Structure formats: C-alpha cells, structure tokens
Amino acid sequence: MQTPATVPRIFSQARRRSRWQRAAARQGTGHAAGFLFEILAEEIEDRLGFIRHEARTGLLIGDPSGQAASLLEPRIPHLERASPAVLDEEAVLPGRYDLLVSLGLLDTVNDVPGALLHIRHALEPDGLAILGLLGAGSLPALREALYLAEPDRPAARMHPMIDIRAAAALMQRAGFRRQVADHFPLKVRYGSFDRLVADLRDQGLTNALASAPPPLGKTALERARAAFLARADADGKVTETFELIVLTGWG
C-alpha cells in the first residue's frame, strides 16, 4: 500500500462525498433514477443465495438509493451503513465484519490497492466482501460527445476506470484468500444528452476529479448534445453502455 504522500491524487475526496450526498438527496425525492443500484442489489442477492454465506455483522458502504440496505437488513442482524468517507485513503474501516459491501465507490478511490487491503483487514475469518463498481467499458457515447464538444482543447471530463483484468489482479494482490471478478454490460436507451447526465447525477456518478475542468460553455454544450444524438438509431434514441464489475473476495 502506498503512503498518503505518494498516492497520486486523481480524485477529490470532497467532490466524491459531495456527489454522493447530492445523490442521496435526489434519491429521497422518489423520482430519481436508481437502476444501477437496483441491478447491483440483485447481484448481491444472487451471490448471497448461491454462496449461502451466513453473516451476523455487516458493513454497507455507499448505496445512496437504499436498495441494497433494504435487501441486507432482514438478513444481517447487525448491519452498519457508512458514507464514502470510510474508503478515503487514510481511513481505517471501523470494525470487523462477516460481510462487507461497497457499491459505486471503488473506482473513484485514489489508492485502490490500499482500499482493498483495508477491506480485507476489516473482514472476520471467512468473511465475505462484495464490491460493485463501474468498469472501463462504461459510457462510450458520453465520452465521444464530450470529446467532440471541445475538439481543439478537449478537457479531462471523464474518470479513468478499472478494467476487469486489473480488478481481478488487484483483488489477488490485496491478499483475498479466494476471489471472483465478474462483469457484464448494461445497455440503456436515451433520448437526450441531458437525460443521461441527470441519471448520472441521481446515482452519484458525476465528475469527482481533483483537477476539475470548468463547466461546458453554451456552445460546447450544444455540440455535446448534437454529437450524442448523432449516434441515435431510427427511433431517435442513443444506446449507452454501463459496464458493471462485481468483485467477490473471502478474507
């Protein structure tokens, strides 16, 4: 694990917490998109059913939608919930657990190997970690639209993301006794650039880069909208891809 002084600061911890808090507030309205967390919650349920892992203590990190919490609370007598702050680079997780679940956060941690070590150390013997995140195959339509919005001076508006091979290697490097890395694409249809951006805000998936570029100007925003819709099918909708990675590891 790298020391705090040597970890590259790609992501802003403050911006990551802020986007999560905004997502939690939007989810509370009852009108926010939550499909990614719904699918991740289903993946957790499938794994727990298949593995038949009995847990008395658990920690759930993230999940602004509350969907995973609704699934886990009836199954785990002592379930704690935590904000993204517990996966900050200098943080040590607050206890030892039979089950630890993190959703939508690991891909915006500066020191991923260090975070995985903290997670493994927070597991009881034979404890289980299930970690859901967006993978490197995500959001190709959005990436292209943002690039074409500023063709002369493209800004870094999209995060670097972890691919499935790197994710599996990082789990092994962190010392999990056994590990499984799964990934699959989710295709979502959009009628506008703005609807996609709203869905990302609803689910806490917007920009958390430490060196954030200025907002798109009016002209650049119109270019982004046009470039996005240029990918539309005959029905006027664009297919966007979310690559979901689910990592399972035993302590």
Regions inferred by a protein language model and the residue ranges of each:
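N-terminal, positively charged/glycine-rich alpha-helical extensions of SAM-dependent methyltransferases
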Residues: 1-42
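A short acidic, Gly/Pro-enriched loop at the edge of an enzyme's catalytic core
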Residues: 89-100
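A short beta-strand submotif of the Rossmann-like class I SAM-dependent methyltransferase core
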Residues: 102-105
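A short glycine-rich, Lys/Arg-flanked "PGG" loop and its adjoining helix->strand segment in the class I
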Residues: 113-128
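Conserved catalytic/acceptor-binding region of the Class I
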Residues: 130-193, 206-214
